[in-house]
């Protein structure tokens, strides 16, 4: 049986990367929420 997690750096960056987050209003909300919470890593 094939495992469900087949890692790809490109796919990860395009969907969860910093620039992907900054591209939309909701993504910016995510970044701001993580900044406010004091997260060390804001995005993948």
UniProtKB/Swiss-Prot annotation:
It comes from the Bacteria. This is Large ribosomal subunit protein bL34. Gene3D superfamilies: 1.10.287.3980. Signal peptide: none annotated. GO terms for biological process: translation. Belongs to the bacterial ribosomal protein bL34 family. The gene is rpmH. It holds the Pfam family Ribosomal_L34. PANTHER family: LARGE RIBOSOMAL SUBUNIT PROTEIN BL34M, MITOCHONDRIAL RIBOSOMAL PROTEIN 34 FAMILY MEMBER. One of its GO terms (cellular component) is ribonucleoprotein complex. GO terms for molecular function: structural constituent of ribosome. Keywords: Ribonucleoprotein, Ribosomal protein.
